[in-house]
Amino acid sequence: MTFFERYFELLDGPDPHSSLELVADDVEFSIQWAADGTRKSRQFVGDRDELRGLIDAGDTEGWAHYVSHSGVSGDVEFALGETRWDTGERIGTFLAVAELDESGRMRRYMVARSPVLAFPSER
């Protein structure tokens, strides 16, 4: 199981805060979020406290992350996937990258999400 498969399984599970077990204390992140097909998007940046705040504020019911492609280069892992409603309907496509520390925890995290573009699913 890849890092992102483990991370998203915890994030989407009954205790989303358990995903923080895979996050380094000194994490830095940037989340690029496009809600629709317009040119407007939002960026969320911060550290572990801000990531916890996003989990606190997040609406995580009724949908989940699905990793379709992944790769590893040294201590960097990549994942391409989709968010889907529980019905299976696609919400959006995401591309995530993480630099892992020596303990395998996420040290740097960047993800972009858009509902506009879909890729063929491998899994």
Labelled PLM ranges:
Residues 1-15:
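Short, aromatic-enriched amphipathic alpha-helices that serve as compact interaction elements
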Residues 7-8, 29, 94, 109:
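Aromatic side chains
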Residues 17-20, 24-73:
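A solvent-exposed, acidic/Ser-Thr-rich amphipathic alpha-helical stretch
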Residues 49-123:
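A beta-strand edge to alpha-helix "cap/lid" segment located at domain peripheries
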